[in-house]
Amino acid sequence: MKFMISWKIAPGHHRPAGEAFLKSGAPTPEGLTLIGRWHAAGSATGWALVEGDDPTALAEHTAQWADLLEIQATPVIEDNEAAQVLARVYGG
């Protein structure tokens, strides 16, 4: 399953968040594969697309950053998967 993680650096935490990222590289825990990560230039927001079947790995990853970032993780599907769902629902 794929999850889109979005984050915003908590107010007053930009420097510690940046230092933590530089120190660790923000690796994902076992059971979670990083597909891509993007940072909005000049802002405190970013996104990461991860894949894994173990929801506890996702919980672990977000918990590791929860003191510095406001985080949301959303399950996402690709176009072909969405098309299959729409075909079932709307008979296409």
Regions flagged by a language model, labelled:
Residues 1-92:
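Conserved, structured core segments of small domains
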